[in-house]
Amino acid sequence: FTPGPVELPDRVLSSAAKPLIGHRCREFSEIFAEIERKLSLLLKSEVPVIILPSSGTGALECLAVNFLSKGDKFISVSCGVFGNRFREIAKRTGAEAVCMDVTMGEGCDIDKTVSFVKEHPECKVLLLTHNETSTGVVNPIKEIISLLPKENRPIILVDGVSSVGAIECYPQEWGVDGLAFASQKGILCP
């Protein structure tokens, strides 16, 4: 069992019952721009938010295929089912996983995680899960990143599927390079 999608508020359900509008019309463009603006405010980000017509899994795949290639190495820090899933998605690129497994139900220890990353400078990417949906553990992403060197550090990709909109998540401020999330959990949308 995993939580989600969430129950939608009546106002969202009512809005979804309205007639569709064309994706090439001005009204759609205005709504889309407003959604991008509001997501940027939610994330406190000046970096453009890219909206994908996919699930959270599709967003994670997008991160993996755009930052990893066959022969690359990446660090996967996992404390549950969805951390493992992000790892498997990344491995499909042909990249090699260097794994740090945390006991399921426990969060990432800041010092151990930072030390592990520093021990593997050959790794191009670091995969982290902000909120591990399978256990409800929130990982200290901000604190981990703050202790990594600013230069010569891996690209940091974060699974925020069940955290964004529910708990604080400020990727630009924290130093996250890529964040994947979906609308059906903390954003309370279809």
Predicted regions and their residues:
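Conserved PLP-enzyme active-site core in the AAT-like
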Residues: T2, V6, E34, G58-P190
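N-terminal amphipathic/basic leader segments beginning at the initiator methionine
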Residues: F1-P19
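Conserved N-terminal alpha-helix of the aminotransferase class I/II PLP-enzyme fold
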Residues: S15-C62, R85-K91
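Short, charge-rich amphipathic segments
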Residues: L13-C25, K44-I51, F74-S78, E132, ...
